[in-house]
Amino acid sequence: MANTASAEKRNRQAQKRRARNVQVRTGVKSAVKKLREAIAKGDPATTQAALKSAEKTIGKAASKGVLHRNAASRKISRLAKAAAKPAAAAAK
């Protein structure tokens, strides 16, 4: 329990930030899930649209400080690689 007014305020602010960050993280997870589902279906157009959306969502999370920029970059890279795999297999 906070003993001072400033500690109470810090607690309120932390709760607001946490709620906001959880919402952003949930959006990232949802975008990644949609992309993985699109990859599983094998439709290139849907996959590209989902990849673009996921990249945008992850980039925004990194810019807001919810994700570290290197973690966001790594996640985008791995998702792009996974999205390109079925297209490369179909081209052979």
From Swiss-Prot:
Q: Which GO terms describe its molecular function?
A: small ribosomal subunit rRNA binding; structural constituent of ribosome
Asked if the Swiss-Prot or TrEMBL record annotates the protein with the keyword Transmembrane helix, the reply is: no
Give the matching SUPFAM superfamilies.
Answer: Ribosomal protein S20
- Return the annotated region ranges for Disordered: 1-28
Extract the Pfam families matched here.
Ribosomal_S20p (PF01649)
Please give a single GO biological process term from the UniProt record.
translation
Q: Which UniProt keywords apply?
A: Ribonucleoprotein, Ribosomal protein, RNA-binding, rRNA-binding
Its domain of life reads: Bacteria
This protein's GO cellular component annotations are:
cytosol; small ribosomal subunit
Similarity section:
Belongs to the bacterial ribosomal protein bS20 family.
Q: What does this protein's UniProt record list under function?
A: Binds directly to 16S ribosomal RNA.
Q: What is this protein called?
A: Small ribosomal subunit protein bS20
**Which gene is this protein's source?**
rpsT
